[in-house]
Amino acid sequence: MTMTDPIADMLTRLRNANSAYHDSVVMPHSKIKSHIAEILQQEGFITGWKVEDAEVGKNLVLELKFGPNRERSIAGIKRISKPGLRVYAKSTNLPKVLGGLGVAIISTSHGLLTGQQAGKKGVGGEVLAYVW
């Protein structure tokens, strides 16, 4: 059965694993999910990620990050642009998540970027998700 929104599925798996204090989470692999994982690692929300071969296709494995007393590094994740309601932002009107404490993941013509990176490059795009 095909998935309607694979990005929402990825974010939900990540949110659930984070809430249950799992060390890692496994999901089906795609290029856009790998790029989102790369942004999450650069911003310090996860410790790492890798692609593993599965019986059918490939799996993406995200290693979750916790503080010294098992504090979660991800407080929240929200999918913004959905298949039924796309949300776009101009370069002059890019969103700030929690006043700059969180990260907006934006799909631009330069690839997936954070809100800050898109602002520096002067490009807008589709707002995929907020992570804080």
UniProtKB/Swiss-Prot annotation:
InterPro entries: Ribosomal_uS8 (IPR000630), Ribosomal_uS8_sf (IPR035987)
GO CC terms, sorted: ribonucleoprotein complex; ribosome
GO MF assignments: rRNA binding; structural constituent of ribosome
Coiled coil (UniProt feature): none
Key words, A-Z: Ribonucleoprotein, Ribosomal protein, RNA-binding, rRNA-binding
GO BP annotations, alphabetical order: translation
Subunit structure: Part of the 30S ribosomal subunit. Contacts proteins S5 and S12.
PANTHER family (UniProt xref): 40S RIBOSOMAL PROTEIN S15A (PTHR11758)
Family note: Belongs to the universal ribosomal protein uS8 family.
Main function: One of the primary rRNA binding proteins, it binds directly to 16S rRNA central domain where it helps coordinate assembly of the platform of the 30S subunit.
Protein name listed in UniProt: Small ribosomal subunit protein uS8
Encoding gene per record: rpsH
